[in-house]
Amino acid sequence: MKSPRFRHSQKYIGSKPYYGYYENDHYIVSWCRGHLLELKNPEEMDPKYKLFQLEHLPLIFQPSYKVIQENAEQLQILVKLLQRPDVDHAVNICDADREGELIYREVYEYAGVNKKQSRVYKSSFEAAELEAALNRLESASKYDGLAYSAKARQYLDYLLGMNITRGCTTKLAQNKFLLSSGRVQMCLLHEIRQRELAIENYREQSYYHLQLITDLGLKPVMKTEDQVLNPSPLKSLGENLKDQYLTVEDFKEGTRKQNPKLLYNLTDLYKDAHAQLQINAETAKKHIQNLYEEGFITYPRSSSRHLPTEQVDRVKGVMQALAKSRYSLLVQSVDIDAIDIKHKTFDDDLVSSHFAIIPTTKQYQEEGRPEIEKQLYSLVVKRFVGNFMRPAVYLVRDVSLIDAMGNTYQIKESVLREKGFLEVFQEEVKEESVETFKVPILQKGQELQIYDFELQESKTKKPALHTESSILTFMETAGRKIDDEHLKELMKGKRIGTVATEAAFIPVLHEKNFIDIEKGKIITTPIGRAFIEQFPVQQIKDPLYTAEMEGMIHRIEKNEMSYENFIAQTNAFVQKITQEIIRIPDTVSYNLIETWKKQIEVCQCPCGNGIILDRGKFFGCSNHPNCNKGLPKRVKEKTIPTAQVKKLFEENKTDIIKGFKSNGKEFSAYLAFVNGEVSFNLPSVEELSLGQCPKCQKGKILNRKTFFGCSEYQNGCDFMLPAKIKGKKLSDSQIKKLVNNHVTDFINGFSGEKGEFTAAIRLKTDLSICFEFPTTDDRTVGKCPLCQSRVIIGKTNYLCEQYKRGCDFIVSGMILEKRITASQIKKLLEKNMTDTVKGFVSKKTGKSFDAKLTYDSTQKRVTFIYEKKK
């Protein structure tokens, strides 16, 4: 078992600590730190494999293990304990999953012993549960299928990864750089590229619905099987139907329930952590694992959203424990006594090895805990408690009508009758509802006269670039994306990768320079695009294949497929893959290498004889070992932007970089070369200053993340400005204007009761702040190039005050995902050209680019002026 888990239990068991284990009269307890052994690389089994050569492929051998050196000491402790003559029984209490089983079996087999073996397979390690499990041990042989499935997955990934990497590095990269990948990585890279291609090929289309206007004020909409792209037939139909009648074909009134969200599985928890806490899955994983190991939540690496029926009493116990915590008010919305096996959460058929993630009865003390961990625990608790609240109940009226030509029309209306869980979780309202029904009770055969019609125009939706959250969804539901219904059924329950490993794949692809992540959007790099497009084995890219492999591994776990059969199929497939890679034309290799060279070049090295290259985990000189200049890609938990690396090597100093971390605290600094070594230069208060403090007149106003405050706060100055006002985060530049000029520019995006609004913030003489709302003169940014009237700032556009009254001048405030500032529009109107605006995102490629804007008075639209590449 893991050492943190036992340390939290030892006070109950009363064991004495020894170096690397605990012991009492009945038990010896020791632990692993993840895997203590790993698979050998080919060159460690035969030196001839040190060189990557095509004639070596395919490489097919039985896995052979080596000791992970940093864990060698603990492994030897375990081996000696297992080999002790007085030890006659080994109990596996590692994680209740494939990896936990494999970690134990690797050590046991390495020790070379033959002793009685048992298993504790629990989703929680609360002390009472652990003690009960030790009193009711299961036979280790019951989990042989699980062990073989773990070995099968390990063998599959080992063999495929080794042969794909060596084959592609040798054939595609000509051994000039490493092209490392595996089955899941290739599948995900392919999906990311396919989404980019869908965006590039997207063409927006309008489609139309016919809405009739009838007596009783009702507006039924015509039902169509497909999107209607041509409005003319609908318009003709609408004209013909005027003064005719619709007949009520069916009227239904009933209730519809909206249930609370199901309990968390790991994928859902990762996605909410990404959406609500703005953290990636890899970061969330560390804190979730810590919550589990310390006994605050149940086993997290679960794909289930349900609980077995035997957990009813446990749920009640957890609710009662939470009722004594800071979540007591939340728990009051649950009728604990009414929880029973009839609740939708309890379903034995929908729980496999592990049930959903829920809190335990152990009280979580927030003091001293990491902020992210606290927020993740809160997500788990709120989802758990909300799941057992009453559903929301809507009263629904649904009317189906028919015209004289047999076309069908529909009206639906809902009234929220019982709020249920929506009383607490208001953000989860899914459907529009009205206070009272406008649709009256209608009788079948009743006629409604048609007075007029409207054509409703809608636009097809452009696909969005993938985010980490959407990739997690793709991994979980890959089978359900297939159109064929039979294949959908076959793929049910299968996925890409496992919940235990899904957090790692996006960071790995990013680390290998196959993808970039810009503002949360995932895009392929030039080398990532070239690699996935030229990789010849379609099966490896196909989610169906990857999920089928997971399905076969699952069948081994259930003893429905033999390990030997799986190995034979894997070996045959590897033979096929290597042959396809070997047949790749040499011209493909040349183009890929040229793409790689362009991608990794950053700037000239100061040594004068080399180029600074992006080497993956670090930047270094191409003239190595003659030049040792370099920089790690991540410094103090901050990934250094390539633009700043370029600046460092060209100018010896970066700009101020925010987001370095030391002892859990963020700080800003320059990176600079001092005597040839990279060092931190902390910015002075003057450099960070946004202006002189208007209160004490001595200190400087500094950005403190959640507020702006005076540098003299320790000497008694309490002047402070919030970082966010009415939902709008204020920029350093606007705070600088507020402090120095006592008023900001007009800022868009404040949130009020009536929606978003624009205002300036003024610092009054008593140092309080207030809003100033723009007059027409304030909103004027210049003269219209078409009619010479005033151009004013609208809600979402810059437009002529005569717009729709004879003038067509209008410019969107958001162009290709980039907000256009009023100052740039002023320059556009004065000089017919803005400055270079950075960060437009191409509709065709999804890539960002920089350009100036100009206004074409003939075509009456803005156009781009691209800077010539030097």
Curated annotation (Swiss-Prot):
Positions bearing the site annotation: Interaction with DNA: H35, R153, D157, R301
Topo IA-type catalytic domain: residues covered: 143-578
Full protein name: DNA topoisomerase 1
InterPro entries cross-referenced by the UniProt entry: Topo_IA, Topo_IA_2, Topo_IA_AS, Topo_IA_cen, Topo_IA_cen_sub1, Topo_IA_cen_sub2, Topo_IA_cen_sub3, Topo_IA_core_domain
Encoding gene, per UniProt annotation: topX
Stored Gene3D superfamilies: 3.40.50.140, Topoisomerase I, domain 2, Topoisomerase I, domain 3, Topoisomerase I, domain 4
Domain Toprim: 1-128
Source organism per UniProt: Bacillus anthracis
Catalytic activity: ATP-independent breakage of single-stranded DNA, followed by passage and rejoining
